[in-house]
């Protein structure tokens, strides 16, 4: 945040552990820190809050912030179900407050170029999209990534990136979503899932996400006139454009800091 121009200062930090909050504040030269959510939202000097608590706390934490007139940037997944999301958006709209899911990949410079390529019809009509993301999650089965009580599982943890990418490409919601394969662990969360998404224009997309296997974070968009391949769609610095009858073109957009600066 301190390296990004024309943004407000980050003057406060909240941590439920007082010692860790103090240590973080001192390390990053933050003058104030809080040990409770209530103390934070009641501070009139706070304009906006970044919520990065466990998944199942997002709804209640965001709601508390909105109730006290704070703008909100909430980490992904925004909530764990649609009902909660709709309630928060309605609250923010009624109170004229800003609220957004913090899916930082939406703001990467390469995706501005990708949108432009697609809007210009360079690869024609999009027919098929595929993306995958996987890694081997470590830790005890009671940890957040495996715990259904904490909103764990592959879909909510990393599948959000896949779905965010599909939204960038299509610009709309799918007409139908089908789970073609899923593995549920002993905690009731998905270690692996494969989704098939169908859109009104006939485009079909496939999304694979797993926290039990290493998968390259690549994606491919197939059109009637060509294709686009992204070797890493999450960090999105490079895409390879192949148009029928032409040599492949590599397009690169490196980030300035770590990628999060564009979201801010």
Regions found by a protein language model. Give the residues of each.
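N-terminal Rossmann-like dinucleotide-binding module
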Residues: 1-28
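Rossmann-fold dehydrogenase core element
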Residues: 86-104, 125-128
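Beta-loop-alpha module in the N-terminal Rossmann-like domain of NAD(P)-dependent dehydrogenases
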Residues: 28-91
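Contiguous beta-strand/loop segments that form the cofactor/metal-binding neighborhood of enzyme cores
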Residues: 164-236, 264
